[in-house]
Amino acid sequence: MGARASVLSGGKLDKWEKIRLRPGGKKKYRLKHIVWASRELERYALNPGLLETSEGCKQIIGQLQPAIQTGTEELRSLYNTVATLYCVHKGIDVKDTKEALEKMEEEQNKSKKKAQQAAADTGNNSQVSQNYPIVQNLQGQMVHQAISPRTLNAWVKVIEEKAFSPEVIPMFSALSEGATPQDLNTMLNTVGGHQAAMQMLKETINEEAAEWDRLHPVHAGPIAPGQMREPRGSDIAGTTSTLQEQIAWMTSNPPIPVGEIYKRWIIVGLNKIVRMYSPVSILDIRQGPKEPFRDYVDRFYKTLRAEQASQDVKNWMTETLLVQNANPDCKTILKALGPQATLEEMMTACQGVGGPSHKARVLAEAMSQATNSVTTAMMQRGNFKGPRKIIKCFNCGKEGHIAKNCRAPRKKGCWRCGKEGHQLKDCTERQANFLRENLAFPQGKAGELSPKQTRANSPTSRELRVWGRDNPLSKTGAERQGTVSFNFPQITLWQRPLVAIKIGGQLKEALLDTGADDTVLEEMNLPGKWKPKMIGGIGGFIKVRQYDQIPIEICGQKAIGTVLVGPTPVNIIGRNLLTQIGCTLNFPISPIETVPVKLKPGMDGPKVKQWPLTEEKIKALTEICTDMEKEGKISRIGPENPYNTPIFAIKKKDSTKWRKLVDFRELNKRTQDFWEVQLGIPHPAGLKKKKSVTVLDVGDAYFSVPLDEDFRKYTAFTISSINNETPGIRYQYNVLPQGWKGSPAIFQSSMTKILEPFRKQNPEMVIYQYMDDLYVGSDLEIGQHRTKIEKLREHLLRWGFTRPDKKHQKEPPFLWMGYELHPDKWTVQSIKLPEKESWTVNDIQNLVERLNWASQIYPGIKVRQLCKLLRGTKALTEVIPLTEEAELELAENREILKEPVHGVYYDPSKDLIAEIQKQGHGQWTYQIYQEPFKNLKTGKYARMRGAHTNDVKQLAEAVQRISTESIVIWGRTPKFRLPIQKETWETWWAEYWQATWIPEWEFVNTPPLVKLWYQLEKEPIIGAETFYVDGAANRETKLGKAGYVTDRGRQKVVPLTDTTNQKTELQAINLALQDSGLEVNIVTDSQYALGIIQAQPDKSESELVNQIIEQLIKKEKVYLAWVPAHKGIGGNEQVDKLVSQGIRKVLFLDGIDKAQEEHEKYHNNWRAMASDFNLPPVVAKEIVASCDKCQLKGEAMHGQVDCSPGIWQLDCTHLEGKVILVAVHVASGYIEAEVIPAETGQETAYFLLKLAGRWPVKVVHTDNGSNFTSAAVKAACWWAGIKQEFGIPYNPQSQGVVESMNKELKKIIGQVRDQAEHLKTAVQMAVFIHNFKRRRGIGGYSAGERIIDIIATDIQTKELQKQIIKIQNFRVYYRDSRDPIWKGPAKLLWKGEGAVVIQDKSDIKVVPRRKVKIIRDYGKQMAGDDCVASRQDED
């Protein structure tokens, strides 16, 4: 922020902070507004450095001004901020933004007048930019430089990313600076794929050109010799003029700026396009001339959702504006459909409108109408009476008028079904019963269980059923429910449903078609009068004769109705006759295998009483349960069932309807545990890009899967009556209940089994399943893809899973799992942060949740300060005032979320790259991508695993977290780009190799860089003063002392209050650092203090540790050592006495000597000593810590043993007069041991080869024994490629690990010796126990598990190292800032976003990306600099 904050300084900053945002308002400009403005300028591709001067501000205003009229609120705010900043730079006194804008306008008017005056004086009234690509060559000729591919590429990216939003206009203006009409046309041609927008732009240019011709008429007579012709409108647009003419006009004296004029026309057109694509109001949404109706509807509803209006007003907008603002072709069709048409009907009717097929269809209809005009005229004269439609009122039921004109009081409820709670337009009856009357379904609705018949015995094919006459129909068909005889014909739909019919005494074959409204038969003679009629079908319009009241027999069932006769390719029985004979479509359900469920052993079902409910809740529950019982989801039970679970009801959000809830907590406690089949939700960044995508939602997911019959009794519940008027109605579930712990696991398992055959049959379809959400993607064409989707829906329906159309998303964007998916990108669904005056704990929790969700694609989100507000135990409703830091953090997050950010999809063929940046205050942000600037996903890391840490340690933790996340999503780890120098990392890693594993990475120069602020010395500093420090505190009084004694006779003790032993130890170190020189040796007896400081933290939650860190940074050299307490060590004993006087109770000191003696004999642990000798834990732990035999070297963070994955230590130990050869894997503690006949080189070499055959051995570390130094062992090492090293005492790579393991092995052998006859058997038993039955160290692994983990990690790391070598196959040619000659080739060391690091001979340089050309090393094929310079891009 430092660079941005430097825009204003001193008095100017004071002036800035006195200016009000609004006239008479309280808020004033602050530094944060400048920071915000600089970030916004980067978004608009403008240099934020321009804010530092008045001239720069003026340039920014010139770029922003053309887009102000159509720009967003953010653009206006940016313009206002820059205008105010300009006034401050110029020293113009203003009180508020409005006054600043007025002053700015005055300045602009003055500068315009000056420019006009200057033009009049010089005869040059041109406004042409001096930056246009017309340059003078050495011969003095004006030469045109074509617009560069880089500029065109930038323009294409602008259109792709901004999609004709207001930002497009200033970007176009900047990219086309000084361009000729030919250049401008090149720019327009590159985005010619946007046909609708280009059509609008073309119309605008034609209008402007015509206006130019009107205002600039052609002069009469011939053109004088040597004089140029004046440009016409088409010349300016570049259609009738050559490039040479355009250059001549632009460079003549006086010039005619045809490029600027044409650019102005284009900007006018872009403004119109922007208003259409980014409208401010719903009134501005208009369908483009070639825009598909579906795209227009998407834009209309997207804007409609944002409108601040009531639902009634929105309904009116939909009914009128949607049709009114459609293009002429669509409007004609929509008006013909009538006012009651549904949106689906509109979209179907307007599909393909505007294309050649549509025009051909319109022409065919016009011709058919022309040929039919005679018939129409006859009908109009009355020779033919057409069928008159009887108008009937929905409201009062009377004929002769419609409901809209009805004078009777409005009937309550729906006019179609009579039910209350919805209106006619929202009625679902129309969609559900497409057979025109309420025909009964013997198994209930599709996808629901019948109360009379379970799924197990249901038919397994889809069928068309025709009712028999022995089962008479009522008028509505309602009485049929539940009393149906199954003696009727069943026709499966695996083949065309062709049946024999009898009509007019003739036998014919006809197709039963539930999609046809009318019955149409091929040419035949029927008795009676007929009327001419035109009917439309898939093949077009045909003329037919209409016969009324014709008797017909279908499958033995008789019906009388209207029959049409004409040239039909197949005889069709339509719904007008199918309804009469009681034909129904049935969707039988395949049986889903039930999963057996049991209660936990020894437990019985729940017996919780039902609590009292209000009358309205009882009524609501009764109605819900009645419907569920009809659908077979629940069944009534008697008093024999002793179990019960309470139920209650809540109102649905924004609805008057009720929702039933069952409190299954008690049953969940008693039900067996389930293993969740799916452990997390799929992430869109892991999806591969697919050509066609569909998102489905399975309707009533749980209610489609049956519950184990033996378990159903435990789900019993009761609906009580008011005042106990009647006994309660008892039910139990037949299907998976909502809220029961087993439902998710059983549903997921059942759904996976059901989808498995479809997945096998259609391997090209990718199906992501999470609960009832299905994402289906493929690389098929959209038509083929949708065919497959229909097959999938049929497959699901066969198993009883319905698929609601309203949740079937066919077109992008797809809403899935909280994400918004587009064909080539994804984002999180719209996130709006609430604006509140006061914030409760619950509000802040919700806010943090939203920000965490957004952080997976919005880089830079921070929540640390907001989370700090939630520390401690607080009530959810408690109001929390926001700190200044939290307000700033929230404001920054709001800015980040203002601009929508998208992620891309995963490409398995490309590498994953993860880049991490440090944000400060312990917060890190990262992006995972495969191509620069196209993030797969982003995230943040802010976890502090301890109270004291440093940036390197946190960075390592962040890398490990990102690696785990990547393996979960993509199954592989990314390459890392980290803001830390290799030297810094190696320095820290050499000491703390056991902190964590980290994959291969490369350095990226992204400030702020991570560094180690200080380093501790490995050896005592010669000549430096040595401080022996100690501290003591009394637990009861909380009083303490801290002090030091030096080797030069100095000493100091300070009293402390409200302290602890640990604090006093740290305070003593702080005193020593404060009172010492630049170099100091410090000796402490505190393991706690040593552990904190040796980890080299650079931040801590403890103020005292932060003070120590500050002192350490000031020092040149610091050596820190530890000695055991109370051991009579000179300086330590002196300082211990100093700080203990009057503080420590010495009652327990009598037991220390006895405890030490006991420990030296038996090496008992600290817990045993604390119990047996009544010692404080800290003293007992120090006794163990001071025992060299109880310390396993290399296990603690302070260890210095080399623990590379391939290092083993070998040693011989003796037991029972026999030799045991022991090999220890240093990094894991894994042991291989064997009893050998003799301690010879031959036996040792044989053992070593066996070890190398089992494990990857790189280095063996041995002592100088004769068997290890023998020629046989050396030969074995040479053959197996093993390096042999020899140890000496106190060397960091000494024999400490294997010596310790020898003791451990002997200890275990002693424990199991009586179980084995031979020593060699006991040795192998002990090896097994040590390797697999003892857990210790980081992660609680056994030694066997740890060695496998280490080797696997090492293999992964080496693979990553190989990948990074690939970058060395490139060569770089580069230019210095002043020298235009290309230099090179140089070696590429690192490639970043803004710069590259190269090595040219011995020099290492950092060069901006724009000044380099990166190419592959093609050997001698590249001839010279000219060839290289012609290559425009390295990507």
From Swiss-Prot:
Residues 1201-1351 form the Integrase catalytic domain. A motif (Nuclear export signal) lies at residues 16-22. Residues 631-821 form the Reverse transcriptase domain. The record marks W988, W1001 as: Essential for RT p66/p51 heterodimerization. Protease: The viral protease is inhibited by many synthetic protease inhibitors (PIs), such as amprenavir, atazanavir, indinavir, loprinavir, nelfinavir, ritonavir and saquinavir. Use of protease inhibitors in tritherapy regimens permit more ambitious therapeutic strategies. Reverse transcriptase/ribonuclease H: RT can be inhibited either by nucleoside RT inhibitors (NRTIs) or by non nucleoside RT inhibitors (NNRTIs). HIV-1 lineages are divided in three main groups, M (for Major), O (for Outlier), and N (for New, or Non-M, Non-O). The vast majority of strains found worldwide belong to the group M. Group O seems to be endemic to and largely confined to Cameroon and neighboring countries in West Central Africa, where these viruses represent a small minority of HIV-1 strains. The group N is represented by a limited number of isolates from Cameroonian persons. The group M is further subdivided in 9 clades or subtypes (A to D, F to H, J and K). Resistance to inhibitors associated with mutations are observed both in viral protease and in reverse transcriptase. Most of the time, single mutations confer only a modest reduction in drug susceptibility. Combination of several mutations is usually required to develop a high-level drug resistance. These mutations are predominantly found in clade B viruses and not in other genotypes. They are listed in the clade B representative isolate HXB2 (AC P04585). PANTHER family: ENDOGENOUS RETROVIRUS GROUP K MEMBER POL PROTEIN, RNA-DIRECTED DNA POLYMERASE-RELATED. This is Gag-Pol polyprotein. It comes from Human immunodeficiency virus type 1 group M subtype D (isolate ELI). The lineage of its organism: Viruses, Riboviria, Pararnavirae, Artverviricota, Revtraviricetes.
